[in-house]
Amino acid sequence: MSSTTRRRSAWVAAATVGVSSFLAVAGITPAIAAAGAGQPATVTVPAASPVRAAVDGEYAQRFLAQYDKIKDPANGYFSAQGIPYHAVETLMVEAPDYGHETTSEAYSYWLWLEALYGQVTQDWAPLNHAWDTMEKYMIPQSVDQPTNSFYNPNSPATYAPEFNHPSSYPSQLNSGISGGTDPIGAELKATYGNADVYQMHWLADVDNIYGFGATPGAGCTLGPTATGTSFINTFQRGPQESVWETVPQPSCEEFKYGGKNGYLDLFTKDASYAKQWKYTSASDADARAVEAVYWANQWATEQGKAADVAATVAKAAKMGDYLRYTLFDKYFKKIGCTSPTCAAGQGREAAHYLLSWYMAWGGATDTSSGWAWRIGSSHAHFGYQNPLAAWALSTDPKLTPKSPTAKADWAASMQRQLEFYTWLQASNGGIAGGATNSWDGAYAQPPAGTPTFYGMGYTEAPVYVDPPSNRWFGMQAWGVQRVAELYYASGNAQAKKILDKWVPWVVANISTDGASWKVPSELKWTGKPDTWNAAAPTGNPGLTVEVTSYGQDVGVAADTARALLFYAAKSGDTASRDKAKALLDAIWANNQDPLGVSAVETRGDYKRFDDTYVANGDGIYIPSGWTGTMPNGDVIKPGVSFLDIRSFYKKDPNWSKVQTFLDGGAEPQFRYHRFWAQTAVAGALADYARLFDDGTTTPDTTAPTVPTGLQAGVVTSTEATISWTASTDDTRVTGYDVYRGATKVGTATTTSFTDTGLTASTAYAYTVRAFDAAGNVSAPSAALTVTTKATPSDTTAPSVPAITSSSSTANSVTIGWSASTDNAGGSGLAGYDVYRGATRVAQTTALTFTDTGLTASTAYEYTVRARDVAGNVSAPSTAVSVTTKSDTTPDTTAPSVPAGLAAMTVTETSVALTWNASTDTGGSGLKGYDVYRGATRVGSTTTASYTDTGLTAATAYQYTVRATDNAGNVSAASAALSVTTKTPQTGGSCSVAYNASSWNSGFTASVRITNTGTTTINGWSLGFDLTAGQKVQQGWSATWTQSGSTVTATNAPWNGTLAPGQTVDVGFNGSHTGQNPNPASFTLNGASCT
């Protein structure tokens, strides 16, 4: 299951205007008093220009192919009004409880899609149309929020506590608890000349399936006969309320549906209730909209077309002005509040400056006796932060909002957000949950020992716990992509530090093995961050994250790739670039279908469709005695299930799958096409095209060198540690697969591995294979035989080691310790385990260890434990705290000169070089190497290898290498190496790999063509026969024609040159009549291929 959007209502708030009957549960429908439903104007899905300029580059072509699938009206991504659905499919329950709802998230991804389309094609009309559609249907119009003029910034809302379980609701409004003042309300009104709020509401029922008819601009609750989109809300009742426990309600309440007070008294307790409107914005979606428009303006300006997007840019700046409400505490209380009676905030005392979960606003429908309210949010999740948007809103003159204090607010927010990421970053890279200024949603005192961030308490799962909000890896992709964008756009050093730690963790946890590709799915967190100290961050040695499951969520994979690509483009890191490319290639080759891309999803959680309430547990809670009806007549009463108040699901074309499951059958499976995920894939393809693809990308087909020097380390009766000498690669080695006999027992990203669960007194043979980001795998190493120790009778642990020395640089710590002894007659000392905080960072037989890759000016705590052959482990040594040196210590020492320069592989057009790694003793750390061909620098690399391409056959070249460190010091040049490229050979050959994925009457074929000869192919034509009546319908990356059974694919302008060993991927969608055999043979330029 993709966890996608998880939105919360703004809980409970009401304007304090002397009337006690105002329910203000944020995020419900508009309060329009217009009569008559009216017919929504039919808005066709905005296609791109009917004629667009030719686009070069394989990945730009892929982007356009995916874009065209999304924008094809026949594929069902948009409604008749031109509104993007959450998904093509209707039977879908996640944050939206129906696939044909929409979210502010979907609109923000649409804006991203059109921004990228404008960059690729220079056509900006679709972007402007997307914003106009959002403004019309997702931002409440003036008539939808009619009583904002009554809003009083000095008394924003009436307090009502949140609770941890839905059964504690409704929540009593309490005017005796004072809130603070709203410092931006009057300013916004003065700036824009009215009191309207310019934010998207987060959720809408596009097809009016519920029948509330809360139609933007047309009416309040016009009922089931109203056509077009309808503002609705769901989440209202605390962190335990999952989507399965929600009661849908209109965002405008006229008491037509629900109970006697509509739906209000399910959520808030009051003496009486008034008709009203209420909306909730989701901060990440509005910020993403600003983010997309920032890039659109950059690209349009580069094209000389800034005027084409100027109006949309101005609207995005306005949205950013109002988005500031999410930077404030819910009831504008001071930051660090731990009691409902804590002091109310004045001015910026209530600003936490983080993008919190929402802001919300509402008011009366009666304009003759109006009232209105506004709230921020106390809860901040790292996955909602957007430092790129904050930076743009505070530094880009075109995007800086008009309000006088907006620029300063967003500048403070950018810095605070980056600190937030740093505070929450686990010692091994992942970003933990978030923080709250209102513990338990009621300003309670946090438990003793709760770490804090500027007074806000750490929460591992902010906002919701069913499932925990930071279990889903997608939050990592979403949150960190924006950090990577900021780093790419501005070079921000703090953003880079976050990424330098996050990227290797992510890269190591992605597999790109063809159809079995996978990315992390669920995470497990251990420990907590330390209380934040901006002057001396600790690096959180006591906080770690573990990937507990993997999956094929195409949207998460694509947004992860986008984060890696922005980082790679700025840093020059090839491992992240190549991993992202390989991931996108795997999805493109294995997951395409006629609607876009997809993977099979098994939905065991659909068992909750018919769950009923269990006291203090799961299920929809309806208070005793409460009854009401949905617009279609479904009864709402205690004991109802999710399905009972959504009976329309029983008519869904896919319902039989679910019913079979509920009756005891197999878990249902689906191929979903979520709008955000499809757009994320398109975005990643466009990013690669823009940042890396010049139309002549040469795939990496060279495997790393074979690992050598295998040797045994610590060996006990049940464990064996082995190590080896690092391999080299033409790009970068990304890991090693370790085999025990013929069985792969693990993967390592370093040059050592510990195999556990072994049998005593048994010989095991180990081999190791190296692999790179492109998936190339080396031959196995020479085998190493290790014999485990005999089962000992020793149950006594060795003596405790004592740390005797420590030293540090800016990026490393070295510790030494005294030798331990084992008991007389014992099994013997095996080695030592070294811990940084709670994380074991090394096993060694030596008495010293150097920990590298650390952060400057940061304190780290180390302990050492001794281990004997029997597996007994000593108590830890006394901890020693070591602080790394400051980056400000000037490093003026150059790295050592690279030695051992050699040519590994030489072809007619390329030379693969390797050399021995340099060392750096100046403290700043080795940065990389500059490679020179003659006097010209031809490339830089972070590893001790480099491949120079585009050379001329039979030509002599001379190479030297210089090492660089992070302080900018450069070594002297290595000894020169002369290399002559190979002489061209006559003749040529080819191979073709053909894979087809079939369904019903259609199929997608992926074709990989490889030049296996020794000469370059300039221009190619592939031929083959489809012998069972199959037809080619749509192809990509080539010009496709078919005559009878014969199919011909001719190269595109950008992939016609195939160097020896080079591969090109093409493909097509086709139809069949029941049989779909693969072609029996292939020709390339008339010659047969294998």
UniProtKB/Swiss-Prot annotation:
Hydrolyzes cellohexaose to a mixture of cellotetraose, cellotriose and cellobiose, with only a trace of glucose. It hydrolyzed cellopentaose to cellotriose and cellobiose, and cellotetraose to cellobiose, but it did not hydrolyze cellotriose. Also has weak endoglucanase activity. Hydrolyzes glucosidic bonds with inversion of anomeric configuration. SMART domains: CBD_II, FN3. The keyword Disulfide bond applies. It catalyses: Hydrolysis of (1->4)-beta-D-glucosidic linkages in cellulose and cellotetraose, releasing cellobiose from the non-reducing ends of the chains. GO terms for molecular function: cellulase activity; cellulose 1,4-beta-cellobiosidase activity; polysaccharide binding. It comes from Cellulomonas fimi (strain ATCC 484 / DSM 20113 / JCM 1341 / CCUG 24087 / LMG 16345 / NBRC 15513 / NCIMB 8980 / NCTC 7547 / NRS-133). It holds the Pfam family fn3. The active site is at D513. GO terms for biological process: cellulose catabolic process. Belongs to the glycosyl hydrolase 48 (cellulase L) family. Residues 983-1090 form the CBM2 domain. InterPro entries: 6-hairpin_glycosidase_sf, 6hp_glycosidase-like_sf, CBD2, CBM2/CBM3_carb-bd_dom_sf, CBM2_carb-bd_dom_sf, CBM2_CS, Endo-1-4-beta-glucanase_dom2, Endoglucanase_F_dom3. It is an enzyme of class 3 (hydrolase). PROSITE patterns: CBM2 (PS51173), CBM2_A (PS00561), FN3 (PS50853). Residues 1069-1090 are annotated as: Disordered. This is Exoglucanase B. Residues 1070-1090 have a biased composition (Polar residues). Residues 34-53 form a propeptide. Keywords: Carbohydrate metabolism, Cellulose degradation, Disulfide bond, Glycosidase, Hydrolase, Polysaccharide degradation, Repeat, Signal. Its EC number is 3.2.1.91. It comes from the Bacteria. Disulfide bonds join C990-C1089. Residues 1-33 form the signal peptide. The keyword Acetylation does not apply. Residues 706-791, 797-887, 897-984 form the Fibronectin type-III domain. Residues 54-699 are annotated as: Catalytic. CDD domains: FN3.
